[in-house]
Amino acid sequence: MGSRCAKLGTGHGRGHESSMKKLVACVSQDNFSLSSEGEEEEEGEEEEEEEGEEEELPVQGKLLLMEAGQQEEGAEDADSEVQQSPEPKQTRS
């Protein structure tokens, strides 16, 4: 969970770059794992987890875009409320 927070904190571009660096690191670890079978199995599990995180990255990006869209809509709603508020006052007067 902590690693995901770190990825979000780094930003979109850096997040992708860091994931690429992690993939390179996995490759270098695989070279070492050839010398010991035990590490090979553990690293295999780690690779699967990292692949899952990479698949989630674009989803998180979409969520951020959706949040930005909601904020824009919220601003529009505020404007429409301001426009609507004088109308009832006019009918009252």
Swiss-Prot record:
GO terms of biological process kind: cell differentiation; chromosome condensation; flagellated sperm motility; spermatogenesis
Main location: nucleus
Residues the record lists as Phosphoserine modifications: 85
UniProt keyword list: Chromosome, Developmental protein, Differentiation, DNA condensation, DNA-binding, Nucleosome core, Nucleus, Phosphoprotein, Spermatogenesis
Compositionally biased spans, kind Polar residues: 81-93
GO CC term, one of those recorded: cytoplasm
Job of this protein: Protamines substitute for histones in the chromatin of sperm during the haploid phase of spermatogenesis. They compact sperm DNA into a highly condensed, stable and inactive complex.
Name this polypeptide is given: Protamine-3
